[in-house]
Amino acid sequence: MADAATIAKLDEGFKKLEAATDCKSLLKKYLTKDVFEQLKAKKTKLGATLLDVIQSGVENLDSGVGVYAPDAEAYTLFSPLFDPIIEDYHKGFKQTDKHPNKDFGDVTQFVNVDPDGKFVISTRVRCGRSMEGYPFNPCLTEAQYKEMESKVSSTLSNLEGELKGTYFPLTGMTKEVQQKLIDDHFLFKEGDRFLQAANACRYWPAGRGIYHNDNKTFLVWCNEEDHLRIISMQMGGDLGQVYRRLVSAVNEIEKRVPFSHHDRLGFLTFCPTNLGTTVRASVHIKLPKLAANREKLEEVAGRYSLQVRGTRGEHTEAEGGIYDISNKRRMGLTEFQAVKEMQDGILELIKIEKEMQ
């Protein structure tokens, strides 16, 4: 049972949401009075309550989604709220659907989408993972953060070949190392207001760190938004190479670190938008002709379930006609299908851009 103080805060938060008529978040849409009453006294084994789930969305009424999972059990215990939000965000992933088993597929199917190097500036594929036996950010203790970091850094120090590299803890990081990582666009900052409000940044920078290989094409973030963000990237459009590197890294890490997995939802993450495959495959791409015809760009993107963002990711503008374009779908399909859909869409965009020239 949640304590009286928590329930009082929840009642207050619910009133605030109800009064916010211009709030468009999925939290507001699906936290009905019935659902609220059903969930407000519940508590996970690790002590998380509905307040942990909704407080970011209550504090930031301009949230798109507005909920986070404080631990793995929250997805089950608070499913009357999470399930409809997941179905809405991951279009058509119904509450009776089951996410397929992990399948990276035939990695030879992925190619260089821009062999002439005229359009794609860089390519990146990432996935998120949570370590089994640990809650997500809001419920972690400082000791757990440190324990996780030591497990992760020792696992990564065993990587060989192209993946071999160095782990840099954020704690005690020198200004020089910090600046170098910023210049390489590798350093993550303390969370934005949405993550801050979700209590995702406690004990900062304890247990946080960055690993990268010597070629700077493989990167792992430890305890940023998720326990692990595993990232493969390089300049140019060779999606095949980027994907193959990610797959071999994930398989290597998985041998040593058990990941949180849910029968129905796939791999578990802090934010419900990343569930399932957790895979985001993206390119930075120059499309000057399509940039001038945004409607056409969005139409093609929509056909292949692509998300079009500004150059520096969410909530930014396209600088010099350069877009960040990625797969939108992460649930109800395999890793292979998610990245293949993105590859097909990018090839189509390049084809149309060429025809318009």
UniProtKB/Swiss-Prot annotation:
Pfam families per the UniProt record, alphabetical: ATP-gua_Ptrans, ATP-gua_PtransN
InterPro entries: ATP-guanido_PTrfase, ATP-guanido_PTrfase_AS, ATP-guanido_PTrfase_cat, ATP-guanido_PTrfase_N, ATP-guanido_PTrfase_N_sf, Gln_synth/guanido_kin_cat_dom
GO biological process: phosphocreatine biosynthetic process
Domain Phosphagen kinase N-terminal residues, every copy: 9-91
Catalytic activity reported: L-arginine + ATP = N(omega)-phospho-L-arginine + ADP + H(+)
Domain of life (superkingdom): Eukaryota
Family: Belongs to the ATP:guanido phosphotransferase family.
Protein name: Arginine kinase
